[in-house]
Amino acid sequence: MSFFQLLMKRKELIPLVVFMTVAAGGASSFAVYSLWKTDVILDRKKNPEPWETVDPTVPQKLITINQQWKPIEELQNVQRVTK
């Protein structure tokens, strides 16, 4: 008995199959979308410390209210010493 014959015999399974197919498709498309975003880093060999390339003058949050972004002197000194 094939899958479609089973669905035609038990019609109450059709909505379940449709919802599961849509959910699996949505989850798969979101996973692929997440991999192509620039926030996700998969190649750690080229840039093992990606947080050092973040510009401190650019806010990284969705909402920033009255916040000043300043470089931290101690971190700047550590970066200069390690490079």
Swiss-Prot record:
Expressed mainly in stomach, placenta, small intestine and colon, as well as in normal mucosa of esophagus. Down-regulated in esophageal squamous cell carcinoma. One of its GO terms (cellular component) is nucleus. It comes from the Eukaryota. This is Normal mucosa of esophagus-specific gene 1 protein. Belongs to the complex I NDUFA4 subunit family. The keyword Nucleus applies. GO terms for biological process: response to bacterium. PANTHER family: NADH-UBIQUINONE OXIDOREDUCTASE MLRQ SUBUNIT, NORMAL MUCOSA OF ESOPHAGUS-SPECIFIC GENE 1 PROTEIN. It is found in: Nucleus. The keyword Ligase does not apply. It holds the Pfam family B12D. Keywords: Nucleus.
